[in-house]
Amino acid sequence: MISVIIPTFNEEKALPSTLPHLLEQPGDYEVIVVDGGSVDRTCEVARRVAETDLRVRLLKASKGRASQMNAGAKEARGEWVLFLHADTCLPEGALTRLNAMEPNPAIQAGGFAHGFSGGDWRLRLVSFLDNFRCRRTRIIYGDQALFVRRKLFESLGGFPEQPILEDVAFCEKLVRVASPVILDEPVLTDSRKFVTMGIWRSLARVLLIILCVEFRLPVLPRGFFQDVR
């Protein structure tokens, strides 16, 4: 079984498309939406879906992607925990493939290649650089739908409670004890936020993150990672 954990904060625009798309996936899984204090209709959207689909649960936790994902993992029942951003969709058949991996002890964790909706060449470049980095380092970003066996996740202490780059910090611990697999079928992230933020700024952000991770530079200011909704 897979526990899909979706941290949310003011995601009323993304969740109405992400949840139905996710629930079309066949497989043995549950969906845990963990809200961090949204002031829009995010909880209403999730609650309405949960009322009609027993696979879905809505939890509330203190704001912060790390604390929300950790809270979801504590309530998870699956062999796998998979962390999915609210504006990102899994490729077709992703969960049945992960179900099939469950008996294989050699596979302890992994993620997906990344892509954006739309056809902007600059966003394709962002994804290309991100995927190149990921295959080289095995450091999986949060928007690549990181999945890990629940017991291993717990043994590593979950995500560190830091405001940004909690996914990088966790994966730095993960790669010391496992070799995450990178699946070629890409997840697709809605390009809206990146277009609103500015695509060139998004590209610069990816490059700076790569520099920070590769050369152990100081963590970038939190404001540089602020979501655009």
Question: Model features per residue range: what roles?
Answer:
Residues H21, D35-E44, T88:
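A conserved acidic beta->alpha catalytic loop
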Residues G93-R122:
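Conserved donor NDP-sugar-binding/catalytic core segment of glycosyltransferases
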